[in-house]
């Protein structure tokens, strides 16, 4: 005798998270952005493991298709900060590094090292090598003697000893890292790649952000403004916080809840030829002063100036300070 599946005679209770998927996906006319409060509640459920895997995938891809709003990003960030058990540490710059480089070497790492030598306390964080063909910060920490920290205590020690610490996202927000790792399952990057740049988990004096795709920079700036953070958002080379000397740079800033904009003209009269290969030893040689190369010198000095601009120095002063820091750096690695 055949056993047939039981009939559903009573309507199942709706999952509490279903409302948020419905808000985002209810057709062209019915769908809308989440409010800041809804975003905070939704991300809170995700972080508390109260969401089914199918719901999470749908939620992330609907957000990606719609394009997240400043209010959503602010709400998501508030949910994470409310659950983040981070100590109180004195940090000048929050420096997210999630994109990886493919056209040029990561000169921003030398910029960060040079700033740290001069008393600027920098917290860097990243999400690992998620896309093939790119060079990620995590792969170069040992080469450049940048401390890899796996606990907040190690971060505090590294900041006190040398002013620079790198901590992987997986060690302080593992649920977010898991969502980033869905990239090769879902076929697209999720909004978490963008969210990670806004988080500023230690409440640094300024958060630096690089957003490559046009139109997103202002959204990120507005989200940081809603959170009361000081931040500068740029379209950095390859999506990393690194000024491209071959192009104009637009700075999207927010300070004290007020937005500001600044245009920085390109530094090089001619475009540089992209290197045929990314040779890590070239990074070390430039730091040690063994080779003269105009592109990295322009890029890293301008990137230092960007950071100093975020800490309150006007543009001309920031460039002068950056050039002095670079000229007087300790060239040992």
Language model: regions and residue ranges:
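Acidic, glycine/proline-rich low-complexity segments that act as flexible tails and inter-domain linkers
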Residues: 1-104, 116-118, 122, 269, ...
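Residue-level signal for inorganic ion chemistry
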Residues: 59, 141, 196, 304
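A generic, well-ordered mixed alpha/beta core segment in the N-terminal half of proteins
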Residues: 90-157
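Structural motif
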Residues: 92-94, 120-123, 139, 147, ...
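Short, ordered loop/turn segments at secondary-structure junctions
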Residues: 127-129, 171, 236-238
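Phosphate/diphosphate-binding glycine-rich loops and adjacent basic-rich segments that engage nucleotide
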Residues: 150-210
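A structural signal for small-residue-enriched, beta-sheet-centric alpha/beta enzyme cores
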Residues: 186-288, 293-297
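Short, small-residue alpha-helix embedded
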Residues: 300-311
